[in-house]
């Protein structure tokens, strides 16, 4: 359901909870919809450290309950993790006065409940946080922050769901230290594994904001490869002359494709491949997702080059390995020290380029809907919905206008039928009126009386008057 909707509406991103079935290091416990290939699946980490709450290890540790991957066809899951333990939530009681007010203005501590507020744990708490981050990423493009890290420095763009997803995954931190399994048992993890996926969400490592973050940002949206095309290439050069403090080059490729049948053993339909080479060292390829070979399972691929040196140049390759359709669109994101502007108009393509004039914002009908869905016990809870109701209002208004139009057309048709019937009756009656010759033949013969007031009246007028 999510995959097909996102494929049909490529400015849409669904952010869903991975689930809470991971106790005991239970593998492949991420279930639908968290195992959908196009969504951004979110696992739960701890929220703060032991210094604040006893037993808490901090956001670099995955919560014991957070569902684990891989999916049944071997894809990475969850995609990312975010704080999901002891998150303060509303606990309104609609039948009680002041239901949303905590007692005496106090705030509940971890695991504590009180009037109006309560503390909750679960991937259902993590997903809304990531959905909020996704909303900020969308705003970053819509308000043109990507130009030089300030508002309105670039054209207003309507980003694809693939671009928003790639941006968040590209900045995710792989410094996950382990999984808390309770009773002091910590399971070690590795980058791109099935505990934390691509890592811990970090907006400061995902986007460049002047004076706030120290990472350069490049992106290409709405790119397309056709079956049989040679690889597309993109060039980046590491430039630390302006004080950039990023040590790594991170590149992420993401694409949204049509949904696969339930229970598929290989769900990837269109297989794109990402790899990076360093100029002068073309013999060495950096492959994605921690592998030494191409990835033929995931529709998100990430390459991280540790310690990218100042002045070194890299070529990013995106190629179509195997396509089941004629072509495939994709989004590509890179972060690192690039110097100067983070992006220029000639290196960024907007999915909806016809609406990318610098003087205005994106049309409301092309705004995305970001939904955070939580899967708890098989139920899907909508945690956050960013939707422009104008889209739905326009659809409702259009339907209402069409309904009125049909009703009007029906009335007009009924009137036409009524008008057609009226002259037909008169013509028939005129045919019943005897011709002059027939009247002459019938003269002197007794006239047969006809019923109907109108007919009798006409016959009386037709009889010859007596002298």
What are these regions (language model features)?
Residues 32, 84-182:
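Hydrolase catalytic cores
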Residues 394-461:
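Cytoplasmic C-terminal tails of single-pass
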Residues 368-381:
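Single-pass type I membrane protein transmembrane segment
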Residues 352-368:
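Extracellular Ser/Thr-rich, low-complexity/disordered mucin-like segments
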């Amino acid at each position: 359901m999510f995959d097909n909707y996102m494929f049909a509406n490529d400015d849409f991103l669904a952010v869903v909870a991975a689930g809470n079935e991971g106790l005991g290091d239970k593998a492949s416990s991420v279930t639908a919809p968290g195992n959908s290939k196009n969504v951004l699946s979110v696992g739960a980490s701890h929220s703060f450290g032991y210094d604040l709450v006893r037993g808490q290890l901090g956001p670099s540790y995955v919560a014991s309950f957070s569902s684990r991957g891989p999916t049944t066809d071997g894809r990475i899951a969850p995609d990312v993790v975010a704080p999901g333990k002891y998150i303060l939530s509303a606990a309104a009681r609609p039948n009680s006065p002041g239901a949303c007010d905590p007692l005496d203005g106090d705030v509940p501590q971890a695991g504590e409940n009180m009037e109006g507020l309560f503390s909750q744990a679960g991937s259902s708490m993590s997903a809304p946080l990531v959905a909020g981050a996704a909303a900020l990423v969308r705003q970053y493009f819509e308000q043109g922050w990507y130009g030089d890290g300030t508002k309105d420095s670039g054209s207003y763009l309507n980003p694809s769901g693939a671009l928003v997803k790639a941006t968040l995954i590209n900045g995710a931190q792989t410094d996950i230290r382990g999984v808390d399994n309770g009773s002091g048992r910590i399971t070690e993890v590795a980058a791109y594994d099935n505990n934390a996926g691509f890592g811990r969400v970090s907006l400061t490592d995902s986007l460049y904001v002047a004076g706030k973050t120290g990472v350069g940002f490049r992106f290409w949206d709405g790119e397309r490869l056709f079956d049989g095309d040679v690889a597309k290439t993109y060039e980046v050069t590491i430039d630390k002359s302006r004080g950039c403090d990023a040590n790594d080059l991170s590149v992420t490729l993401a694409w949204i494709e049509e949904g696969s049948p339930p229970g598929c053993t290989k769900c990837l339909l269109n297989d794109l491949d990402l790899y990076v080479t360093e100029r002068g060292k073309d013999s060495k390829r950096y492959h994605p997702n921690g592998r030494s070979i191409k990835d033929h399972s995931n529709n998100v691929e990430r390459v991280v080059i540790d310690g990218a040196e100042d002045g070194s140049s890299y070529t990013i390759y995106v190629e179509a390995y195997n396509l089941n359709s004629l072509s495939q669109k994709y989004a590509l994101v890179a972060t690192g020290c690039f110097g100067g502007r983070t992006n220029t108009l000639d290196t960024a393509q907007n999915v909806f380029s016809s609406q990318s004039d610098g003087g205005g914002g994106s049309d409301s009908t092309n705004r995305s809907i970001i939904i955070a869905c939580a899967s708890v016990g098989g139920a899907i809870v909508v945690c956050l919905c960013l939707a422009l109701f104008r889209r739905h209002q326009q659809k409702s208004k259009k339907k209402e206008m069409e309904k009125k139009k049909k009703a009007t057309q029906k009335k007009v048709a009924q009137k036409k039928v009524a008008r057609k019937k009226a002259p037909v009756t008169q013509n028939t009656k005129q045919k019943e009126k005897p011709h002059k010759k027939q009247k002459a033949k019938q003269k002197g013969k007794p006239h047969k009386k006809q019923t109907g007031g109108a007919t009798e009246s006409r016959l009386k007028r037709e009889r010859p008057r007596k002298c």
